[in-house]
Regions:
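Structured, solvent-exposed acidic/aromatic patches
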Residues: 1-246
Length: 246
């Protein structure tokens, strides 16, 4: 992997042709922390400290230990960035270490907010520390966005709807939005005709056949073949800061 290749004396000089070894490693560490954050939020206690070493019989780590470890990993990754050659092949930030730093600190803030639900003091302190860096996603130009050119690499929602016609916005949601004249409705789905919740696939297929304007998830502009996917945005960070300020 990127970290091993850029750390191994036999390969690091060759790897450096694609950018600073330190910066390649730092970016990989930030992404690793992000993915393990998703994993532990889904499944709680998971293999972490002994993972990615080629062993299958490894211990599970407590989520209470994983969160601080991920935050520490993000801090260490940011500290590792240097002024070396710009990393090539970076499809997110084109090797821009300032933007990667903003993403890392933004992840710290998001993690800290969730941590505060079980350890208020630790979560508050970590959020404040990340905020104090002044380097986090605060404008849409800094959003963590995955771009899809179409063709062999399509937006996942576009690919999903090539074969699935039974997934849409639930009628409970569209009903609430309609009843409250919710101006955000258009951002949730393609129409106000929601699918009744809990249908089997056959019943859902029958419903959408009888209701051709049923509500796809997201508006069409967000699920075209080449529509980008925003993973973490300045809007999310603004909501996080508002929640932390309560």
């Amino acid at each position: 992997n990127i970290i091993n290749v850029n750390s191994d004396a036999k390969y690091k000089d060759l790897a450096a042709l694609n950018g600073s070894n330190a910066n390649q490693i730092a970016i990989a560490r930030i992404l690793k922390a992000y993915y393990f954050w998703i994993v532990t939020d889904y499944w709680g206690d998971v293999p972490y400290s002994q993972s990615l070493k080629g062993n299958s019989d490894i211990a599970y780590d407590k989520q209470s230990a994983i969160y601080p470890a991920l935050i520490a990993e993000l801090k260490a990754a940011v500290a590792q960035f240097d002024a070396g050659i710009t990393v090539k092949g970076d499809i997110i930030y084109s090797g821009n270490t300032t933007k990667w730093t903003k993403f890392a600190n933004s992840l710290r803030m998001m993690m800290a907010l969730r941590l505060s639900k079980v350890d208020a003091a630790a979560g508050k302190a970590e959020f404040a520390a990340a905020l104090a860096t002044g380097s986090f996603i605060d404008a849409s130009a800094d959003n963590f966005t995955v771009n899809y050119p179409g063709g062999a690499f399509n937006n996942p929602w576009f690919s999903n709807y090539l074969t699935r016609k039974d997934q849409g916005v639930a009628s409970f949601v569209t009903g609430m939005q309609t009843a409250n004249a919710d101006p955000r409705a258009a951002a949730f789905g393609s129409s106000s005709v929601g699918i009744p919740y809990g249908l089997t696939r056959d019943l859902a297929t029958a419903f959408i056949g009888a209701n051709p304007t049923w509500a796809y998830v997201l508006p069409a502009s967000k699920r075209a073949a080449n529509s980008p996917v925003i993973v973490l945005s300045s809007a999310q960070l603004k909501f996080a800061r508002a929640e932390a300020a309560k």
